[in-house]
Amino acid sequence: MSDKVIIFDTTLRDGEQSPGASMTKDEKVRIARQLERLKVDVIEAGFAASSEGDFQAISAVAAAVKDSIVCSLARANDKDITRAADALQAANAKRIHAFLATSPLHMAVKLRMSPEEVLEQAKRSIRFARNLASDIEFSAEDGYRSEMDFLCRVVEAVINEGASTINIPDTVGYATPELYGDFIKTLRTRVPNSDKAVWSVHCHNDLGMAVANSLAGVKIGGARQIECTINGLGERAGNTALEEIVMALRTRKDYFDMVCGIDASQIVPASKLVSQITGFVVQPNKAVVGANAFAHTSGIHQDGILKNRDTYEIMRAEDVGWSANKIVLGKLSGRNAFKQRLQELGITVEAEADLNEAFTRFKALADQKSEIFDEDIIAIMSDSAAAEEGEHYHFISLSQHSETGERPKSRVIFRMGDKEVSSEAEGNGPVDASLNAIEEIAKSGAEQLLYSVNAITSGTQSQGEVTVRLSKGGRIVNGVGTDPDIIAASAKAYLSALNKLHDPSQAKLNAQMAP
């Protein structure tokens, strides 16, 4: 019988550490529900001690998720661990994930602790955590660059104290597959009680080898949990990509002889949702979930595919959730058809009032474009969810005038708090003028780091999806807006980013937050 690999998703925690990828509580819940549909084993919902916003988000995810284990990260101290346990109270199944650095560099420079002090703190923290939860994971931060003898002592000690999962991260993406696999194997061989815990790998993609290293940790090292994120989202060059791990295990079962419980048909919906919420566009040639992942332009390849798909395809697009039937609804589609399509997309709308509001947005969009695609529906629901969160800034309307040879002018009307305000401004273009008009009133003083436009679907009728990245006071946030009118989408995106800057609960603790 094939061994099972546990899929531990950390999109909501480590993925959120990408600059600008901060998510609201409701956004985290929406992604968590999709991860549950994906049948992820463990969902790391955040770092409870890092901010009040993260604490509330973890609590909301814990209450919403029924089947997956919900996990919170914590530093290896009583205060953080207590905070994690409190946030997870509503979870059907919960895990506390405590981490502590074990490499010589981190111990000396960051922790300023001796190896013996680190060993004792690791033991105390796991002993304390076991009083609050039965499922405890310990991560040796920067584990791959740790000294083998010392790491063996730490791991043996925390297993004795009750750690049920041992995670050995390649925190800085320094490892190579064979060496990392051998490193895990050596640890498991030398730690006397290694059979008392599940071994886990957590790799970063700084050298482009996160997926390969993780698979080597499983195949060579004997690990049985892989920590990963949707789209490989994560700080610096990202994390291990969940979709690549899952499809590698499935496609090369002959080699790995392992299974996972993931419903692969939910991979693309998860990818699209994470991309839309965070504003991080998936590159077209990204494995499994990129727009070109199953595209064949070579005439020879196309001929082979038509004769037999196995000539150039090692997996089916539909197996990972790509749908050949793109056009789903139109202007004449009714409320029941809209509701049914939401269910097919895995989107849950609990209140009738929320469904009615979303359907009103759908009909308004259908008046502007003749064909409504799944991506349009996802964007509609994102706008609806944002409105439900009680935004401080909310777009109402805009008008703009531009003429060749003259500076464009724009007038934007939006809600700020409980007041409706309007402002006019000029700019180098209609988008610049609109954002200047908003800033005339908002006076945020934020620095704009990025402005990008992406067509949600094909054709000139497509909605534009705009991402605006702002920075202020050391915080970086992304705002996303969608509309057939690119100028309106830009204004929505800017206001979305301002909402995140305005929310004090989103300010994170200035501390190392990743194994």
From Swiss-Prot:
GO MF annotations, alphabetized: 2-isopropylmalate synthase activity; acetyl-CoA C-acetyltransferase activity; manganese ion binding
Please write the reaction equations for the catalytic activity of this protein.
Answer: 3-methyl-2-oxobutanoate + acetyl-CoA + H2O = (2S)-2-isopropylmalate + CoA + H(+)
Alphabetically ordered keywords of this record: Amino-acid biosynthesis, Branched-chain amino acid biosynthesis, Cytoplasm, Leucine biosynthesis, Manganese, Metal-binding, Transferase
Record bears the keyword Transferase: yes
Localization in the cell? Cytoplasm
Q: Needs which cofactor? A: Mn(2+)
Could you confirm whether the keyword Coiled coil appears in this record? no
Q: Organism's domain of life?
A: Bacteria
Query: Mind telling me which InterPro entries this protein's record contains?
Result: 2-IPM_HCS-like, 2-isopropylmalate_synth_dimer, AIPM/Hcit_synth_CS, Aldolase_TIM, LeuA/HCS_post-cat, LeuA_allosteric_dom_sf, LeuA_bact_synth, PYR_CT
Q: Which GO terms describe its cellular component?
A: cytosol
Instruction: Give every Pyruvate carboxyltransferase domain span.
Output: 5-268
- Per its UniProt record, what CDD domains does this chain match? DRE_TIM_IPMS
This protein's pathway reads: Amino-acid biosynthesis; L-leucine biosynthesis; L-leucine from 3-methyl-2-oxobutanoate: step 1/4
> What's a single GO BP term from this record?
L-leucine biosynthetic process
SUPFAM superfamilies named among the record's database cross-references: 2-isopropylmalate synthase LeuA, allosteric (dimerisation) domain (SSF110921), Aldolase (SSF51569)
Q: Could you say which EC number(s) this protein's record lists? A: 2.3.3.13
Binding residue positions for Mn(2+): 14, 202, 204, 239
Regulatory domain: where is this region?
Answer: 394-515
Explain the purpose of this protein.
Answer: Catalyzes the condensation of the acetyl group of acetyl-CoA with 3-methyl-2-oxobutanoate (2-ketoisovalerate) to form 3-carboxy-3-hydroxy-4-methylpentanoate (2-isopropylmalate).
Quaternary structure per UniProt? Answer: Homodimer.
Q: Hey, which family's this protein in?
A: Belongs to the alpha-IPM synthase/homocitrate synthase family. LeuA type 1 subfamily.
What name does this protein carry? Answer: 2-isopropylmalate synthase
